[in-house]
Amino acid sequence: MNIMIALIPALLWGTVPLIITKFGGSTRQQTMGMTLGALTFAVIVFFFTDPVYTLKTVGISFITGCLWTVGQMFQLRAFKIIGVSKAMPISTGMQLVGTTLCGVILFHEWDTTLRIILGFIALALIVGGIFLTSYAEKEEDGTNALKQGLITLVISSLGYVGLVVLIQGFKIDGINAILPQAIGMVLSALIMTHSGGTEKRFNKRTLLLIIPGMIWAAGNVAMVHANQLVGVATGFSLSQLGVVISTIGGIVLLKEKKTQKEMLYVIVGVVLVVLGGILIGVAKGA
């Protein structure tokens, strides 16, 4: 039963990119809708929990919210450039490599020979998965789009990795972080989406996009609960399975076109990224 609960974050997070893309809208509208959804859910959670706020908790959580918006906005841009089925495994892989290396360098997580061995195998699998997933048939337009998408995902991953490092470094409790983090998301989204497009940021589509924002936030709360039930290492590993839902959903539901060879590379790449993510979780608990 605990494992089933721990799979909820992967299920929720895996469906979010599909819902966002299906709803459509500009990157600005999607960013505002997502952050407003996260804030709405955070306010609801606030009334049903008993968070403890300190200056450090509020300040760091607010900053992580800003970093999340950077990560999310650039990830949304990547969806439009190279598609969900290609962007998600690459993004997940980059985040796994980034957070793992920061954990090793800053927090000395690989403190045994077994963890070092498992960790390097995991990184090799993830890097291999990224390489395979990013494969594109030699078409000039596709190659240029891939380069642009990769640059966009690097910026996105820097935001996400920075968020994780700050939360871990300052030992911020998940429940305590939710509301100030969501406030940081919305305020930074307002600033980042102020210019850069002619379309309105706030319309009916923006309101519709609040739904995936709430789903993401629900996954975040579920992750906090899952970690308490099965431990951080197992919870982290299981959360990586969401990329499978996003990738397959992008191909099947969103009808993202791929050649037979690209399809094979994507499937194998996703498997490698997931295995690498699970192995990182094993290394954390070893």
From Swiss-Prot:
It comes from the Bacteria. It is a multi-pass membrane protein. Keywords: Cell membrane, Membrane, Sugar transport, Transmembrane, Transmembrane helix, Transport. GO terms for molecular function: carbohydrate transmembrane transporter activity. SUPFAM superfamilies: Multidrug resistance efflux transporter EmrE. It is found in: Cell membrane. Belongs to the GRP transporter (TC 2.A.7.5) family. This is Putative sugar uptake protein lin0215. It comes from Listeria innocua serovar 6a (strain ATCC BAA-680 / CLIP 11262). The lineage of its organism: Bacteria, Bacillati, Bacillota, Bacilli, Bacillales.
